[in-house]
């Protein structure tokens, strides 16, 4: 039923909205840094006549903007926080959109000796036990939430002597890790964008714990009547349609596929 409603919204409020109210989309720095939105949003705008204003922040801040009614729709990657956002009545029509993954990067000489490990928790133990510098986003983003979660699962408590919370976006964190010869956890997309500028190496990948799902959620018009709910639902309908999912599937960075669509099982 939800899929039928989304299709109807897309058809009714599609290409005929030349003078439609712009859509305010709060999204993660990873979708912006990777270049994904710069590629696919123009296709949506061309198809529908809507203009999308993209606000690139961490997931925590994006959800807070939704809680304040300052945006129309959020595209984020922190499932537990997303569910709380919807349960509290701030968001509706949460839809699975796509996934990618996180990786651990660090110095080429890898003093923690995590290169080649097939166990994420052992890799974190190598960093913590050796007190090797680790740079954390520390910004309540989806990446930061994931990082804190895996430290907790490893039953490790980072110490101030080697752990740096910097309150910055992913690109800046990678730069700082590079300057400090430190380790960090990053989404793969931002890593690929930044890699040519860094002397870091990808040291760990592939653990199921590093799975990184993205959802898109409309801000609840019953709570904030001024939001552009029709625009938000139009964007959700397009991104989760066969056409939108194909654009996500076909997106490449340096020849590498970064995002895997999840809204349509094909």
What is each of the regions a protein language model found here?
Residues 15-20:
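Sec/Tat signal peptide C-region and signal peptidase I cleavage site
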Residues 21-47, 51, 60, 64-70, ...:
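Exported/periplasmic ABC-transporter solute-binding proteins
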Residues 69, 100-101:
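Short, conserved active-site loops that position catalytic residues or coordinate cofactors/metal ions
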Residues 73-99:
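Acidic, polar ligand-binding/catalytic clefts
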Residues 104:
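Serine endopeptidase catalytic core focused on the charge-relay Asp
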């Amino acid at each position: 039923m939800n899929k039928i409603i989304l299709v109807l919204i897309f058809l009714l409020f599609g290409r005929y909205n030349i003078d439609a109210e712009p859509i305010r989309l709060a999204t993660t720095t990873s979708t912006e840094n990777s270049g994904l939105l710069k590629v696919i949003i123009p296709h949506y705008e061309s198809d529908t006549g809507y203009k999308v204003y993209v606000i690139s922040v961490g997931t925590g801040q994006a959800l807070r903007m939704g809680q304040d009614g300052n945006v129309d729709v959020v595209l984020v990657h922190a499932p537990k926080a997303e569910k709380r956002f919807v349960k509290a009545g701030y968001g509706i029509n949460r839809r699975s959109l796509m996934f990618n993954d996180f990786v651990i990067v660090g110095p080429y000489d890898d003093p923690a000796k995590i290169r080649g490990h097939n166990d994420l928790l052992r890799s974190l133990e190598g960093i913590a036990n050796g007190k090797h510098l680790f740079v954390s986003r520390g910004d309540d983003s989806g990446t930061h939430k994931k990082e804190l979660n895996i430290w907790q699962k490893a039953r490790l408590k980072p110490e101030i002597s080697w752990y740096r919370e910097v309150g910055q976006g992913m690109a800046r964190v990678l730069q700082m890790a590079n300057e400090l010869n430190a380790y960090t956890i990053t989404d793969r997309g931002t890593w690929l964008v930044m890699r040519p500028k860094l002397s870091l190496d990808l040291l760990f990948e592939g653990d199921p714990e590093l799975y990184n799902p993205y959802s898109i959620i409309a801000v609840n018009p019953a709570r904030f009547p001024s939001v552009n709910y029709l625009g938000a639902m139009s964007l959700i309908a397009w991104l989760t349609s066969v056409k939108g999912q194909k654009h996500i599937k076909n997106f490449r960075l340096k020849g590498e596929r970064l995002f895997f669509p999840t809204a349509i099982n094909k």
